[in-house]
């Protein structure tokens, strides 16, 4: 990711400005909730970020035609919440989450973030990354978890959740546990544990064990392959997807499967995410 033209942190910094300019419109959160027992599939737009920069309406139209049911934002490409909601509605898409910096959830920024996401119909406010020191020790994990617990209480009355997304570095050991497991052991059940299967395995973690250890905490989960040939899409590497789905559908409390693809091989990003969805459908999803 370090060589990307647009880093996740750069994308998030752009999101702050979009939130700050939001008009006071609230359209509710119903659009984000799946209506059937089957878990719907969304796409993390970071997977196709350069295409989104060039032509976001075209990308949303394309992913909807592929069969994706929702999208998770990682930046808003200079558009207001009203504009984004209109584009989603035009394409029959739901907002299944947003990746937003911790700074957008604190202090005076929180109200604007809530308002922006209410307009999108999104209840899931997911912090995608934190500096290493936030989870570097038992005390750091406890202190950071307290921040998330307090935020979870603040947004609960709005029908919303805060959460944290897994990166490889989160699975380094702190004592006899991974930083990830230690952090979530201090978090309240209201804090969403957004596992990223590929990132976890890349960091030496065990995503299956974490899903079992924290039942009901994985309201959204990132589906990402690990291993296999260069640019392997979901189903083409070493992940035990049958086990992932079984855990999500029995104990995880999962409301959304979210595809995130960051390696493309000889495919374009849009071709890669289409391939991921095709493979998921072959697996019965």
Where are these regions (language model features)?
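Histidine-acidic metal/acid-base catalytic patches
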Residues: 2-5, 9-42, 48-64, 174-192, ...
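Histidine-centered catalytic micro-motifs
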Residues: 43, 162-168, 221-223
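Active-site acidic/histidine proton-transfer and metal-coordination neighborhood
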Residues: 16, 23-24, 69-70, 77, ...
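Flexible loop residues that form catalytic
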Residues: 46, 76, 103, 130, ...
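Active-site-adjacent beta->alpha loops and helix N-cap segments on the catalytic face
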Residues: 78-83
């Amino acid at each position: 990711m370090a060589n990307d033209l647009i880093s996740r942190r750069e994308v998030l910094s752009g999101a702050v400005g979009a939130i700050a300019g939001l008009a006071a419109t609230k359209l509710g959160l119903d659009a984000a909730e799946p209506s059937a027992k089957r878990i719907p599939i969304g796409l993390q737009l970071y997977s196709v970020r350069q295409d989104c920069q060039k032509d976001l309406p075209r990308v949303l139209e394309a992913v909807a035609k592929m069969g994706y049911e929702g999208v998770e934002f990682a930046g808003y490409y200079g558009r207001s919440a009203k504009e984004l909601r209109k584009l989603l509605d035009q394409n029959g898409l739901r907002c299944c989450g947003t990746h937003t910096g911790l700074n957008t959830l604190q202090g005076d920024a929180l109200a604007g973030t809530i308002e922006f996401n209410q307009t999108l119909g999104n209840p899931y406010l997911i912090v995608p990354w934190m500096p290493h020191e936030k989870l570097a020790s038992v005390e750091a994990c406890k202190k950071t978890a307290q921040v998330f617990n307090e935020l979870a209480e603040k947004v609960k009355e709005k029908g919303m959740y805060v959460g944290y997304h897994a990166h490889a570095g989160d699975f380094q050991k702190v004592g006899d546990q991974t930083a990830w497991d230690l952090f979530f052991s201090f978090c309240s059940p209201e804090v969403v544990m957004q596992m990223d299967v590929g990132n976890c395995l890349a960091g030496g973690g065990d995503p299956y064990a974490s899903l079992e250890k924290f039942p009901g905490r994985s309201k959204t989960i990132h589906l990402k392959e690990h291993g296999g040939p260069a640019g392997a899409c979901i189903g083409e590497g070493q992940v035990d997807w049958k086990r992932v789905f079984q855990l999500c559908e029995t104990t995880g409390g999962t409301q959304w499967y979210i595809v995130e693809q960051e390696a493309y091989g000889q495919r374009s990003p849009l071709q890669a995410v289409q391939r991921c969805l095709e493979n998921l459908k072959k697996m019965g999803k």
